[in-house]
């Protein structure tokens, strides 16, 4: 177990030292809330890393989507190579929760596709928290959903030591109890195999390393770690902890106690439904719940066992579920990145879940205890916070009102200024925009255009293409993987212009962009609020030659505030640069895609389907094998966009076999 130690050729500069000192002082005073108000490109992540290093506490970093969580995880892994940095997001590639539509009498069964790689990372995250303190977990908002009870999880962990008196069969029984499966043929994560006096286990938190227990009679003679693929022995271990294969694993005693309580709740609910003459609902509930009870009794779990988690945990009705936060020690540190977006997400989670559960309970598909398999309410989330730092370029009212300390980070280490803002009339905006686009392209840069509607984005893109501009659009109908591809292609120069709506705000760091155009900037509303405008302006803050054009006939209150704030920052930045002799430099970004180190703008796709047209069947098979290996490696390194791209290419190649 080590201490947090940053590895970086950079030292805090500009506003960073002062911001670090201000936040540290506030946290050490015992203040619960603090805010880092940092402009785009000011090195907020590096400031966070320095605070973690100084405080030496287990840390949870909350991001508002998987993509930004992966980006942050990648950056913190680079800052802390000697420490544990984990990634905890929803493990569903696809998720359709169970639901009932009374109007059409349609019940939709739960349907989900679980990403095994992400499930492994989730187990790796929770097990790390039980083993050491130098742990950073970067999570999406899904971490406020119910997870298994950490006390039960810890209690079920199997501790094995060299020289321990332990029968082999006793360990096997315990492994089955914590949901490991015996499989002597397809040996994979969460399974074990037995060969004479050898017991091989692949823990739930890894797929590449196994644990070999060697017995001499009833004594553990040797514990060794081995490579699952090659069988090579990697080293000797004196002690090993085997964590449960599921976060919802429960002991036999807990299961036996819980079954009686589930049966009691069923009887009470059936009486209630029968008294309301809901006979069909009562019959349905009896049938479904009895099936679950039998499955739990025989197998120790059932499909949808999380709906009984309140009873399994021994919690009172209405009490908050156990979540990832409960796996942290009490003195943990919480960072909420892009807090102006993340906190509203946390607030909205509970209401959406409750409305769906109401229908399921009312119509006899679930017992009322299903209500307590839910995300945290916002006030419950607040109570679980120890000390938190909100991180945003545009903190909302909640952050500003609650924070006992606010540190501002306006100076960028690169000396870059906030962009110049030009206001132009709406009349003739498209023709003027075309002229600006041509001028920007001639300098080798890219353009972002933000519109108010999806239709306008599509029409404008179509018009630009007709004029010979390499343009594309991006809006909410485009999934994450396609979004990554579009951004990569923009950076590679496949496109010069990207048109979008509100997706052009947080997390789009493209140094090649030298022009951001905001159409209909004077139309008040969510997409043209002060916060939205400042975030959109920030997209141009990565290039020393960039500017922002607002097309508007009137200057709205939001525009005035956004322009005033940008000018204030420019003044501070200019004075600092003049005082220290700094010349603004465009960010030379070692390009990661929005997720971990998928080298984008410096190299186009290593392989292309076009190049495979002349291959023989044997060569195609060989290429599929190579792609598959690379895809697994990319997924392991959190390069999910690259993995998805390879997956698509494998599918196309299979069509050529």
Curated annotation (Swiss-Prot):
Q: Where does ATP bind?
A: 38-45
Q: Where is the UVR domain?
A: 621-656
Beta-hairpin (motif): residue ranges: 91-114
Lineage top rank: taxon:
Bacteria
Q: Where is the Helicase ATP-binding domain?
A: 25-182
GO molecular function annotation:
ATP binding; ATP hydrolysis activity; DNA binding; excinuclease ABC activity; helicase activity
Tell me which stretches of the chain form a coiled coil.
none
SUPFAM superfamilies named among the record's database cross-references:
C-terminal UvrC-binding domain of UvrB (SSF46600), P-loop containing nucleoside triphosphate hydrolases (SSF52540)
Return any one Pfam family short name.
Helicase_C
Gene3D superfamilies in alphabetical order: P-loop containing nucleotide triphosphate hydrolases, UVR domain
Subcellular location as annotated? Cytoplasm
Recorded hits in InterPro entries, A to Z, give: Helicase/UvrB_N, Helicase_ATP-bd, Helicase_C-like, P-loop_NTPase, UVR_dom, UVR_dom_sf, UvrB, UvrB_inter
Please provide, in alphabetical order, the Gene Ontology terms of the cellular component aspect for this entry: cytoplasm; excinuclease repair complex
Q: How does it assemble?
A: Forms a heterotetramer with UvrA during the search for lesions. Interacts with UvrC in an incision complex.
According to the UniProt entry, the note on domains is: The beta-hairpin motif is involved in DNA binding.
Name the family the entry cites.
Belongs to the UvrB family.
Provide the protein name: UvrABC system protein B
Q: Which organism is it from?
A: Clostridium botulinum (strain Alaska E43 / Type E3)
Q: What is the lineage of its organism?
A: Bacteria, Bacillati, Bacillota, Clostridia, Eubacteriales
Originating gene: uvrB
């Amino acid at each position: 177990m080590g201490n947090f130690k940053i590895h970086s050729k950079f030292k805090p500069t500009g506003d960073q030292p002062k911001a670090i000192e201000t936040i540290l002082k506030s946290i050490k005073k015992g203040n619960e809330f603090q805010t880092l108000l940092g402009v785009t490109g000011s090195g907020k992540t590096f400031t966070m890393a320095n605070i973690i290093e100084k405080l030496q506490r287990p840390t949870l970093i909350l991001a508002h989507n998987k993509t930004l969580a992966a980006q942050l995880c990648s950056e913190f892994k680079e800052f802390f190579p000697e420490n544990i940095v984990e990634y905890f997001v929803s493990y569903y590639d696809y998720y359709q929760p169970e639901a009932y539509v009374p109007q059409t009498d349609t019940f939709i069964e739960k349907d989900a596709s679980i990403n095994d790689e992400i499930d492994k990372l989730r187990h790796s995250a929770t097990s790390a928290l039980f083993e050491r303190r130098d742990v950073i977990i970067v999570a999406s908002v899904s971490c406020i959903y119910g997870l298994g009870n950490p006390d039960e999880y810890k209690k079920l962990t199997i501790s094995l030591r060299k020289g321990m008196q332990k029968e082999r069969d006793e360990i096997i029984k315990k492994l089955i109890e914590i949901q490991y499966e015996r499989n002597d043929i397809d040996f994979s994560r969460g399974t074990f195999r037995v060969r004479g006096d050898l017991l091989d286990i692949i823990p739930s938190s890894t797929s590449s390393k196994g644990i070999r227990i060697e017995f001499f009679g009833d004594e553990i003679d040797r514990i060794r770690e081995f490579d699952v693929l090659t069988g090579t022995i990697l080293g000797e271990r004196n002690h090993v902890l085997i964590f449960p294969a599921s976060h919802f694993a429960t002991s036999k005693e807990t299961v036996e106690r819980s079954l009686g309580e589930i049966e009691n709740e069923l009887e009470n609910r059936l009486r209630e439904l029968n008294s309301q003459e809901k006979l069909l609902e009562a019959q349905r509930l009896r049938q479904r719940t009895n099936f679950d009870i039998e499955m739990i009794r025989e197998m120790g779990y059932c499909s949808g066992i999380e709906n009984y988690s309140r009873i399994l945990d021994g919690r009172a009705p209405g009490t908050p579920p156990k979540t990832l936060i409960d796996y942290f020690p009490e003195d943990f540190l919480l960072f909420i990145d892009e807090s102006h977006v993340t906190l509203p997400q946390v607030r909205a989670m509970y209401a959406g879940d409750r409305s769906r559960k109401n229908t399921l309970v009312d119509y006899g598909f679930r017992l009322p205890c299903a209500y307590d398999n839910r995300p945290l309410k916002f006030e419950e989330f607040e109570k679980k916070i120890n000390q938190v730092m909100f991180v945003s370029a545009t903190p909302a009212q909640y952050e500003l009102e609650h924070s006992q300390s606010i540190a501002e980070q306006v100076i960028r280490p690169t000396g870059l200024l906030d962009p110049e803002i030009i206001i132009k009339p709406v009349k003739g905006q498209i023709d003027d925009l075309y002229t600006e686009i041509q001028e920007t392209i001639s300098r080798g840069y890219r353009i972002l255009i933000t519109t108010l509607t999806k239709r306008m984005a599509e029409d404008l893109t179509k018009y630009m293409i007709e004029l010979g501009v390499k343009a594309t659009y991006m809006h909410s109908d485009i999934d994450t993987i396609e979004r990554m591809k579009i951004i990569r292609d923009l950076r590679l120069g496949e496109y010069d212009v990207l048109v979008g709506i509100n997706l052009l705000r947080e997390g789009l760091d493209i140094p090649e962009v030298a022009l951001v155009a905001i159409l209909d900037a004077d139309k008040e509303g969510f997409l043209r609020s002060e916060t939205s405008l400042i975030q959109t302006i920030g997209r141009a803050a990565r290039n020393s030659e960039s500017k922002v054009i607002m097309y508007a006939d009137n200057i709205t209150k939001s525009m005035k505030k956004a322009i005033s704030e940008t000018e204030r920052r420019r003044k501070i930045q200019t004075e600092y640069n003049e005082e220290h002799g700094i010349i603004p430099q465009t960010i030379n970004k070692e390009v990661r895609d929005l997720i971990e180190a998928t080298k984008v703008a410096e190299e186009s796709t290593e392989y292309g389907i076009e190049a495979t047209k002349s291959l023989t069947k044997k060569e195609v098979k060989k290429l599929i094998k190579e792609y598959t290996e690379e895809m697994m490696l990319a997924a392991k390194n959190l390069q999910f966009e690259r993995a998805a791209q390879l997956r698509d290419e494998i599918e196309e190649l299979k069509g050529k076999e």
